[in-house]
Amino acid sequence: MAFVKISEQPSLYNDLEKKSVGEILHDINTEVEKAIPQIEKLVIEIVSRMRRGGRIFYMGAGTSGRLGVLDASEIPPTFGMDPSWVIGIIAGGDIALRNPVENAEDDTEQGWKDLQAFGINDRDTVIGIAASGTTPYVIGAIKTARAHGILTAAITSNPDAPISEAADIAIEMIVGPEYVTGSSRMKSGTGQKMICNMITTTVMIQMGRVKGNKMVNMQLSNAKLVDRGTRMVVEELGLPYDEAKRLLLLHGSVKEAVDAYRKQ
């Protein structure tokens, strides 16, 4: 039986140009709740590896690749982790973030070569993102990584997709046909970003990068974040604002500032 890409079937919606803004936004919204058991399984496996120095690699082409790079790029400022802990790789290289690279996603061997450039090992995790579930670049990387004993996962919008069969853990987010037929940057892309957020946020919490509900390890990269961090220190220690700010800037993070003060 031929594999059918549900995500590329004709849209269930018509006359889109006649809909109100509210109707469009409501129609596009997608639930990912059914994927939580598989996401949980993946997070548990990732955390056990990261505690031994493992990393997360996102692999994708086009929109899927861009979303992986985006999620990876948000880890250092949000959680204060070195960029080497979560890495996004897109078919065609960084130029493909802004411009399409012809045939890049069709190369079944380049994905593994791109992973090898980072010295990938069996403590790492490779997460392939492909709405269609058929992207050769991603599937090739997943298959080879798995053959080398590396944990692999797939995020796709189609059931029983080839990428799901290739990976150890398959996260299938069945959003159905896209609102605009075949435009996987929409429902599939939105769901992919949400799942990536869920994975890395939960991993970072488990790795101790959050306290309570606060980003106590965030990078102090602008005035807004310095102010936010200062107010966290004020709340935690009861210090005057100026003293809390001085302490924060001295130690570089909310966590370090609070720990240093309490050790005095």
Language-model features: where?
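Short, amphipathic alpha-helical interaction segments embedded in low-complexity terminal/linker regions
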Residues: 203-264
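Short glycine/serine/threonine/alanine-rich loop segments
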Residues: 54, 150, 239
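Glycine-rich phosphate-binding loops that contact phosphosugars or nucleotide phosphates
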Residues: 57-194, 203-207
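A short, well-structured juxtamembrane/interface segment
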Residues: 34-49
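Gly-rich Lys/Arg/Thr-decorated short loops/hinges at beta-loop-alpha junctions or inter-strand turns
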Residues: 26-30, 88-99, 211, 226
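Charged, alpha-helix-enriched surfaces in structured cytosolic catalytic cores
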Residues: 37, 41, 136, 190, ...
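Cofactor-/ligand-binding subdomain signature composed of acidic, glycine-rich
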Residues: 1-31
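A general structural signal for well-ordered alpha-helical segments in protein cores
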Residues: 21-25, 108, 192, 196, ...
